[in-house]
Design a protein with these regions (language model features):
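Short glycine/proline-centered loop/turn elements that form peptide/ligand docking sites
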Residues: 25-26, 45-46, 66-69
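Positively charged n-region of N-terminal signal peptides that target proteins for export
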Residues: 1-4
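Bacterial N-terminal signal peptides
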Residues: 7-15
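SH3/SH3-like beta-barrel superfamily modules
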Residues: 52-96
Length: 105
C-alpha cells in the first residue's frame, strides 16, 4: 500500500508539472530617455551574449517562462499588443525593463 501511495503522489506531481505556460504579455518600460533608450534583446540571458535587436519603449513581448532566470526573461517580440502569433523574434531581455500588461480591463 505504501508503494502505491508513493507512486500516486509522484504521478500527481508530474501531472501538475506538465501544465503548459501560454506566456504573458509585457511591454518595454523604465528606460532612461537620456541614455540609450532601448532594451537589448539578446541571444541568451547574459550581457556577454550577442544583441539580436534593440527594443524601443512600448515594445510588446510575450514571456516564454513564468519566472525570470537570474533576472533574465526569455521572450518573443510582438508586432503589436494584439499579435499573439508567437511568430516574432525570440531572445532574452533583462526583466527589470519590462512591465506586465494587465489584460483584464
Amino acid at each position: 500500500m505504501r508503494k502505491f501511495m508513493i507512486a500516486l503522489l509522484g504521478a500527481s506531481f508530474l501531472a501538475g508539472a506538465a501544465e503548459a505556460y501560454d506566456g504573458e504579455q509585457f511591454v518595454v518600460c523604465k528606460l532612461n530617455p537620456l541614455g540609450d533608450n532601448f532594451l537589448a534583446l539578446r541571444s541568451c540571458g547574459s550581457t556577454s551574449c550577442d544583441v539580436i535587436r534593440k527594443l524601443g519603449p512600448d515594445t510588446f513581448v510575450i514571456t516564454m517562462e513564468p519566472y525570470a532566470t537570474n533576472g533574465w526573461r526569455e521572450v518573443i517580440v510582438q508586432q503589436s499588443s494584439q499579435d499573439w502569433s508567437y511568430a516574432g523574434v525570440k531572445g532574452w531581455v533583462y526583466g527589470k525593463y519590462i512591465c506586465h500588461v494587465d489584460l483584464s480591463e
